[in-house]
Amino acid sequence: MRVIAYDRFRPGVTMQQITPYLPEEVSNVWRLWKAGIVRENYARADEPGVVIVFEVEDVAAARTYTDDFPLSKAGLLEWSFIALQVPLPIETLFREGLDLNPPFDRTTKHGEAAQ
């Protein structure tokens, strides 16, 4: 299962307080990425923080990892989680007779054979 985790600074926490922990924090996430546990990692564009996509069994497993992060142990972050699941076979939503053939190669002009 994929779990999206995103953090926020706890009220009153500043970037100055966060900065000393960043090398160890990044190293921790890097090791999880190399192990295939962290699938994606992004900096937030809307506010300071990160968004991490975990490949884990459930939210509790993702929380185990975030709780072990240096910034979490220091009590500087709050985490939120969104569990994702594979969508049902989308074809079940289509009406009978709808074209479900494989997509054509959109890099060629429609009707031309790819070379």
Language model features with spans:
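Conserved, structured core segments of small domains
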Residues: 1-115
